């Protein structure tokens, strides 16, 4: 039996997909984002579920993720958001992976590689409409197209960009990005090019229906978290991930007992301390030392002392029914209580995305359809 494990609720994933689909503007389709092991939720099982739900495309960040999806039998069009390196191009073409292109030298190499394979490489061009990160500046798009369209083994299927702050209440920046993206799409249309346009992430899908174009790219909302708490039109989402462990020891302690490294917590009165075999090695943030909480027998118990590499301690004095080997929920629901990724993220000064990715590295992961497996 594992000391800790992650449970993934595929029924919740399907529910969240349906909420995304309900928000789609007419004519738009879903491109499901499964990069970074589906935000820690398990890329291949999640991808299979999204295929069954009717997604039209999938997106990953890295080439090897796309190759793994193909090896798992996923035939849906797959977009590689970071593009592919020259050493990966032949494999990408053979696997019909769609690289995102933002460098003309890579486009040339890709075309040459495709010609050598007697094939065509299908690509999407990335525009920087204001995020300042990855992509061709809009003012350079026409010159980029002038060369790209001369490459004999390249098929331009799509153009994409990415919102920098669609998850904020103030949509000024997003509106400017949207204007620039529309202008780019108009330029393509004027040249007789019919391509797929996509810019909407989860926040764009929820709050900016005018940004849906041909595809929308939900990511975090598929996994049950809102992109932020500032959205004008939040959705009814269900968390997909639960993180569990168990009590491996219960200890009665006297007043004045230091707990954990450095004795940063000292008991003020006699009580009971539960030791739980989870630590920062398992993705449980050290920043939750003396700040976090876990669920035991449907009740909240504060984390006391420092989070160490493989263990934490919780004060269960107020839960007299607690027993050794009892299930502990570190993320998710137990009874009527719930610890959310947003709560953990706020305590750690980060975002839910990072919490999911960290916890999702746990090697013991099970998948269920609304009724969790026993461990």
From Swiss-Prot:
<dbReference type="InterPro" id="IPR001608">
    <property type="entry name" value="Ala_racemase_N"/>
</dbReference>
<dbReference type="GO" id="GO:0008784">
    <property type="term" value="F:alanine racemase activity"/>
</dbReference>
<dbReference type="InterPro" id="IPR011079">
    <property type="entry name" value="Ala_racemase_C"/>
</dbReference>
<feature type="active site" description="Proton acceptor; specific for D-alanine">
    <location>
        <position position="35"/>
    </location>
</feature>
<dbReference type="Pfam" id="PF01168">
    <property type="entry name" value="Ala_racemase_N"/>
</dbReference>
<feature type="binding site">
    <location>
        <position position="133"/>
    </location>
    <ligand>
        <name>substrate</name>
    </ligand>
</feature>
<dbReference type="InterPro" id="IPR029066">
    <property type="entry name" value="PLP-binding_barrel"/>
</dbReference>
<protein>
    <recommendedName>
        <fullName>Alanine racemase</fullName>
        <ecNumber>5.1.1.1</ecNumber>
    </recommendedName>
</protein>
<keyword id="KW-0413">Isomerase</keyword>
<comment type="pathway">
    <text>Amino-acid biosynthesis; D-alanine biosynthesis; D-alanine from L-alanine: step 1/1.</text>
</comment>
<dbReference type="GO" id="GO:0005829">
    <property type="term" value="C:cytosol"/>
</dbReference>
<feature type="active site" description="Proton acceptor; specific for L-alanine">
    <location>
        <position position="261"/>
    </location>
</feature>
<comment type="similarity">
    <text>Belongs to the alanine racemase family.</text>
</comment>
<dbReference type="GO" id="GO:0030632">
    <property type="term" value="P:D-alanine biosynthetic process"/>
</dbReference>
<dbReference type="InterPro" id="IPR000821">
    <property type="entry name" value="Ala_racemase"/>
</dbReference>
<keyword id="KW-0663">Pyridoxal phosphate</keyword>
<dbReference type="GO" id="GO:0030170">
    <property type="term" value="F:pyridoxal phosphate binding"/>
</dbReference>
<comment type="function">
    <text>Catalyzes the interconversion of L-alanine and D-alanine. May also act on other amino acids.</text>
</comment>
<feature type="binding site">
    <location>
        <position position="309"/>
    </location>
    <ligand>
        <name>substrate</name>
    </ligand>
</feature>
<dbReference type="InterPro" id="IPR009006">
    <property type="entry name" value="Ala_racemase/Decarboxylase_C"/>
</dbReference>
<feature type="modified residue" description="N6-(pyridoxal phosphate)lysine">
    <location>
        <position position="35"/>
    </location>
</feature>
<dbReference type="Pfam" id="PF00842">
    <property type="entry name" value="Ala_racemase_C"/>
</dbReference>
<dbReference type="InterPro" id="IPR020622">
    <property type="entry name" value="Ala_racemase_pyridoxalP-BS"/>
</dbReference>
């Amino acid at each position: 039996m594992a000391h800790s494990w992650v449970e993934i609720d595929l029924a919740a994933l399907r529910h969240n997909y349906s909420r995304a689909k309900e928000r789609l503007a007419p004519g738009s389709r879903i491109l499901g984002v499964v990069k970074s092991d589906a935000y820690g939720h398990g890329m291949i099982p999640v991808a299979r579920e999204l295929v069954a739900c009717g997604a039209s495309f999938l997106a990953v960040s890295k080439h090897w993720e796309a190759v793994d999806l193909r090896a798992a039998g996923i035939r849906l069009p797959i977009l590689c958001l970071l593009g592919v390196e020259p050493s990966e191009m032949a494999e990408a073409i053979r696997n019909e992976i769609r690289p995102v292109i933002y460098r003309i030298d890579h486009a040339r190499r890709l075309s040459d590689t495709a010609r050598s394979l007697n094939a065509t490489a299908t690509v999407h061009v990335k525009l920087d409409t204001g995020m300042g990160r990855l992509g061709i500046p809009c003012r350079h798009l026409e010159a980029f197209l002038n060369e790209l369209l001369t490459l004999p083994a390249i098929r331009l299927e799509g153009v994409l960009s990415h919102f920098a702050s669609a998850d904020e209440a103030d949509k000024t920046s997003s509106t400017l990005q949207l204007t620039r993206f529309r202008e780019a799409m108009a330029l393509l249309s004027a040249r007789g090019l019919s391509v797929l346009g996509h810019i909407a992430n989860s926040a764009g899908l929820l709050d900016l229906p005018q940004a849906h174009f041909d595809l929308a790219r939900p990511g975090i909302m598929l996994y049950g978290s809102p992109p932020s708490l500032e959205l004008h039109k939040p959705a009814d989402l269900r968390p997909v991930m639960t993180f569990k462990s168990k009590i491996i020891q219960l200890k009665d302690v006297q007043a004045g007992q230091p707990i954990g490294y450095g004795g940063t917590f000292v008991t003020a009165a006699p009580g009971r301390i539960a030791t739980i075999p989870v630590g920062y090695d398992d993705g449980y943030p050290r920043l939750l030392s003396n700040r976090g909480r876990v669920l035991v027998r449907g009740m909240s118990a504060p984390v006391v002392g420092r989070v160490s590499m493989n263990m934490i301690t919780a004060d269960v004095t107020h839960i007299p029914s607690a027993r050794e080997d009892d299930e502990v929920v570190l993320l998710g629901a137990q009874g009527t209580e719930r610890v959310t990724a947003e709560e953990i993220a706020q305590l750690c000064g980060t975002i839910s995305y990072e919490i999911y990715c960290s916890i999702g590295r746990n090697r013991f992961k099970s998948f269920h359809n609304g009724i969790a497996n026993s461990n």
